[in-house]
Amino acid sequence: EMCIRDRYDIYITPVIKFTVALTAFLLINHNIGYMEKISSTPIALILALICSILPVGGAVFIGSVLILLDMYALSLEVCIVALILFILMYILYFRFSPKNEYGVLLTPICFGLNIPFVMPVGMGLLRELYSMFSLVCGIVLYFFLNGVKQNETTLGGVDEKDAATSKIVVALNQLLGNREMYLVLAIMVVTLVIVYIIRKMSIEHAWAVAIIFGILFEAVGMIAGDMVLGISGKTITILVGSIISCVIAFVIQFLFFNLDYSRTERLQFEDDEYYYYVKAVPKAIVAGTDKKVTRFSGKEEQDRMTKKRFAEEMEIDEDLLD
């Protein structure tokens, strides 16, 4: 039976695209909406509606254009730095992680909502290792925009002698001199790798173990890293964000990998060349009475199964092969 997600995908996907795009555009307007003409809620709604019928990459592109226009309204020099950053990010993104657009969009959004820890855990659960490149792009983008916001007075000052050079230096320093960004990059990339490795292991409750280890590593790493860097006042935010991220991660597990380990079957069968040892864990949405397990043991059953498969493939009656 087709699951609800597959059955209503034609409706669910546009809604998800619209919601993600609208959230991204509203956060852009709220934090760096320096160009007032494009920084209104109606404009954000219209653009989000357009993004709902476009590939996810369309939202990434439109968001990039909005950011560049806002940067231009603040300062031409900052806009140039942002443009160079976007070019480098697009090269990295399209080269290594072209199918992980949601990572680029959702990472800055989660930072804005103070739940960034869910991103490396969620991507480690649902994606492959190369998705770390989209995660990196999202982290770099967030810290750049956050740095611009914190220094908007300096960057948007009246042009004076050597002011242009000074603005470029300040803008670049949001990336090159940001030790907190490097800390977050290291911890989140390692977290993604840890979660990915654990959830691939052949152990019971692999996803739950991966979530717990990932969240704990992030929380401890961020608190310890902030202490080393002399950053104070973030411990409570980190702990609360970690708890919320953990809850969201378990919701992801329920939606995408909900297994019933109490009904685990261990099967053994063989063919002419190999012995097979199989561990079968049914999905929790399948009722116990509906479960059908075929066991292979002995040459007679193997012959019968081979005959049955052949009959099915040839679309003939199995009795004709007796």
Which residues does each predicted region cover?
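Alpha-helical transmembrane segments of multi-pass integral membrane proteins
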Residues: 9-14, 23-26, 226-279
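Alpha-helical membrane-inserting segments
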Residues: 24-32, 50, 122, 126, ...
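Membrane-interface helix-loop-helix junctions at boundaries between adjacent transmembrane segments
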Residues: 49, 62-136
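Short, highly charged, low-complexity non-transmembrane loops/tails of multi-pass membrane proteins
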Residues: 259-309
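Short, small-residue-biased leader/transition segments that mark boundaries at the very start
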Residues: 2-4
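Generic multipass alpha-helical transmembrane bundles of integral membrane proteins
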Residues: 110-111, 119-233, 238-242
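Hydrophobic transmembrane alpha-helices
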Residues: 10-64, 70-71
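Structural signature of hydrophobic alpha-helical transmembrane segments
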Residues: 35-40, 70-84, 178-186
